[in-house]
């Protein structure tokens, strides 16, 4: 999980979601693409 100021989609499998007020990226194809804004 990377914590970044701005989260971006890195590939086709990435999806931007909101959990508990935080913007996150989850990826089905590449788990290393997981990101959290903060």
From Swiss-Prot:
One of its GO terms (biological process) is translation. It comes from the Bacteria. Keywords: Ribonucleoprotein, Ribosomal protein. InterPro entries: Ribosomal_bL36, Ribosomal_bL36_sp. SUPFAM superfamilies: Ribosomal protein L36. GO terms for molecular function: structural constituent of ribosome. Transmembrane segments: none annotated. One of its GO terms (cellular component) is ribosome. Belongs to the bacterial ribosomal protein bL36 family. HAMAP family: Ribosomal_bL36. This is Large ribosomal subunit protein bL36.
């Amino acid at each position: 999980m990377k914590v970044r100021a701005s989260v971006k989609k890195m590939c086709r499998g990435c999806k931007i979601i909101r959990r508990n007020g935080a913007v996150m990226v989850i990826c089905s194809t590449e788990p290393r693409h997981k990101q959290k804004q903060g």
